[in-house]
Amino acid sequence: RSSDLWVGTERELRINDIGYEYATSAGEGVTVLSNEFLTGGVTLGARFAFRERIARLPDREVSLGTKWPVLSVNAFRSFTGLWEGELETWRVNASIDKVFHIRLFGDLSLRLMGGVADPNAPYSYLYNLRGTNGGGTKEDPTLLLAADNTFQTMVANEFLADRYAAFHLKHSFGTLLVKGKHFKPRPGVVYNAGIGDLSAPLNHRGYSFTALKDPFLEAGVVVDNILSGVGVGAYYRHGPYAFADTNDNFVFKVTSSFTF
């Protein structure tokens, strides 16, 4: 079996200079707004992969995978006074990954992940659900590169949660459907779902966001490796957070897949 455990400590100053302010009560009728957060904390990480095969090279170790699910856990806890820290907060994340190699049908990759954070923490210590459809609004998407295990049609920072769960699925047919001498595209399908909640939305000022109380759903079709590791993907947003205009629910991206 293969298992890793690491513990660390850190001092970090986070400053938001693009309009966000964190609101705290300083007494009856008095609210204090802040955009600077100094923390001193302890980090803990663990990874467990049962019967993982490892190739040992002269300068590093390379994982050859395992037929069992891989569990990863990360936790953070800050303390007032540690490394002069001024904020006490915490959060815990976990994920389970599994790849099924299905003979004559391709590879099915699954990831189940989730997290819980201090409900009274500032914005940057919570979860934005990893939306990768641009950096601002749906009218002006700026990032058109697909990333696995993220939400392709969700605008960056569109949602905010202090607890969430997400499911990511990708099935790649490999070269089973089309295979030429030089042209070896890899068609596949993608499905992503997520849900969460936000306990104290009024603590966060200056940003426009939605608390993810209903399921966020999207489906996609990809063709990887059309040309030298580069492909294309088309994704469709549906469910409770679908836009009224059907065209706004479609997102097209470039995919990349390189083997080293």
Where are the regions that the model predicts?
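Exposed, low-structure sequence patches enriched in small/polar residues
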Residues: 1-260
